[in-house]
Structure formats: C-alpha cells, structure tokens
Curated annotation (Swiss-Prot):
Listed EC numbers: 4.1.2.40
InterPro entries associated with the record: Aldolase_TIM, Class_II_FBP_aldolase, FBA_II, TagBP_ald_KbaY, TagBP_ald_KbaY/GatY
Keyword Nucleotidyltransferase: no
GN (gene name): kbaY
Pathway: Carbohydrate metabolism; D-tagatose 6-phosphate degradation; D-glyceraldehyde 3-phosphate and glycerone phosphate from D-tagatose 6-phosphate: step 2/2
Subunit relationships: Homotetramer. Forms a complex with KbaZ.
Sequence positions that bind Zn(2+): H83, H180, H208
Domain of life: Bacteria
Protein name in the entry: D-tagatose-1,6-bisphosphate aldolase subunit KbaY
Function: Catalytic subunit of the tagatose-1,6-bisphosphate aldolase KbaYZ, which catalyzes the reversible aldol condensation of dihydroxyacetone phosphate (DHAP or glycerone-phosphate) with glyceraldehyde 3-phosphate (G3P) to produce tagatose 1,6-bisphosphate (TBP). Requires KbaZ subunit for full activity and stability.
Enzyme's top EC category: lyase
Entry similarity comment: Belongs to the class II fructose-bisphosphate aldolase family. TagBP aldolase KbaY subfamily.
C-alpha cells in the first residue's frame, strides 16, 4: 500500500455521494488510533498535519509512520499538509513525499490569494500532488493562529467560481458558518450558500471546523456537495479527557502503555462516529 494524493479519494467521494474524513494527527498514537478504526470500517482517510504538527514531530518521521501503517493495515491513505501558508514550505514537504497540500491564503485579498494559490498549484501538479485552497475565512483558533469573528467572512459563490477557474485548484475549502474549535452555541450553517457554490464550482468542496457541529448538519452539507470533512478539536478533547480521567483514578500511574491506550480508545469513538456521519464506511475493497 502507499501514500496517495487526496484527489483520487475525493473524486470517488464526489461521484458516489459521501465524504472522506480528514483527521488531524500529532504522533504515532493518534495515527494508530485513527487507522485502527478506518481499517476495521474500510473507510478511506486523510491524515492531516498543520505546520505546528511538524514542529512537534518532523515530517519525515510522520511520513515514515504513515507508510508503515499503510502496509500494516493494508489500505491506501493520504497524508495532507493542512493550513500551510508558503510555497517554500510546501515545496520542501512535497519533495519529501507528500502528495496533498492545502495552501491557505484566505487572509489575503482575492487577487493575492489567487496569485499564491496558482504558484502552489503550478508546482504541485508537476509532482502529482493535489492542492486545496480556502476562499472566505473561518473564525476560531487553528494551530497558533486565532481569527476573531469580525475578521471571518463567508465564501461568495461567484468569487468561488472565479477562484477555481483562475487557480486550477483541486478542492476548495468554503466558509459557510463553521469555525475552528468548539462552539459556544449551535453554529448557523448557511446551507443555501453551500448549494449555490456547488452549482457553479465543479471541484470537491471541503468543510473545515466540523468538530462540535451537529451530525445532522454535517450530513446535510454532504448531501449538498461537501466531499471532505475536517476534524481536529474533538479528537484532542477525547484523547486528553480520557487520559486525565485515567490519572485521576490512578494517581501513581506512570506507564504510557496504559494511559495512552485509554486516550486512543476514546479518540477511536470519535473517529467511528465521524466515519458513520461521512458515509465513508466500506468504501475500500477488502
């Protein structure tokens, strides 16, 4: 088995009306927990790492882990660069083997965003690497960056059409009312806006900020054309909460084989639920 481009996964999802879950990873345990469930449920998966992830553990180490686990679990997977902001950083990581990258220029004006994304697309497509970009801007906290509500804005459908045409991007992350992190109240998702974007944009659409969004809302976005669903915060909360509870019950405990497994098992339940919500189970042949 191998690490592949997300475009092959997303093309199948778009053709068959489901979404591929993209789970953020941080170390060997998070990769293993996610793939244990994906292997069992035969779900395609995208493992995503932010620049902050690769400050914690080198890309080359993450890549080696993903390659090994792909063989262990006999399934293809995509390793994805999430929320990267420079061509130089992406270029280095693509040369190291990655075949999926998100270039995030959403904080730039439209024309600057287009210019940056187009430069990344031109390079990545020469390396069989798919490219995701974002138009519109989500609020909340992602990695080390915080975007307040006043700076967030939703994706304009006609701008989305122009953006895809000008850049040649493979998938588009849209801002329709979700945010990174948790919500203080139920998010207001602009389903009509999503439907209008889907009418004029042919490439796969991506939902960022799916943690803590009601399952029925996520399912509705998939019905309207979302083919990649990003999940990060819920995984971390489940893992950390279970480990904290274990230490509360075992204050003298010190063996990572036990407390890490508790965290992994809690994370696995989140993964299992998201696969069911995305409708991605049994999409990989045995």
């Amino acid at each position: 088995m191998s690490i592949i481009s997300t475009k092959y996964l997303l093309q199948d999802a778009q053709a068959n009306g489901y979404a591929v879950p993209a789970f953020n990873i941080h170390n060997a345990e998070t990769i293993q927990a996610i793939l244990e469930v994906c292997s069992e449920m035969r779900s395609p998966v995208i493992l995503a790492g932010t620049p902050g992830t690769f400050k914690h553990i080198a890309l080359e180490e993450i890549y080696a882990l993903c390659s090994a686990y792909s063989t262990t679990y006999n399934m293809p997977l995509a390793l994805h660069l999430d929320h990267h902001e420079s061509l130089d950083d992406i270029r280095r990581k693509v040369h190291a083997g990655v075949r999926s990258a998100m270039i995030d220029g959403s904080h730039f004006p439209f024309d600057e965003n287009v210019k940056l994304v187009k430069s990344v697309v031109d390079f990545c497509h020469s390396q069989d690497c798919s490219v995701e970009a974002e138009l519109g801007r989500l609020g909340g906290v992602e990695d080390d960056m915080s975007v307040d509500a006043e700076s967030a804005f939703l994706t304009d459908p006609q701008e989305a059409k122009r953006f895809v045409e000008l850049t040649g991007v493979d998938s588009l992350a849209v801002a329709i009312g979700t945010a990174h992190g948790l919500y203080s109240k139920t998010p207001k998702i602009d389903f009509q806006r999503l439907a209008e974007i889907r009418e004029v944009v042919d490439v796969p659409l991506v939902l960022h900020g799916a943690s803590d969004v009601p399952d029925e809302f996520v399912r509705r976005t998939i019905e309207l054309g979302v083919t990649k669903v990003n999940v990060a915060t819920e995984l971390k909360i489940a893992f950390a909460g279970a480990v904290k509870a274990w230490f509360a019950e075992n204050p003298q405990g010190n063996d990572p084989r036990y407390y890490m497994r508790v965290g992994m098992d809690a994370m696995k339940e989140v993964v299992r639920n998201k696969i069911n919500v995305c409708g991605s189970a049994n999409r990989i042949s045995a």
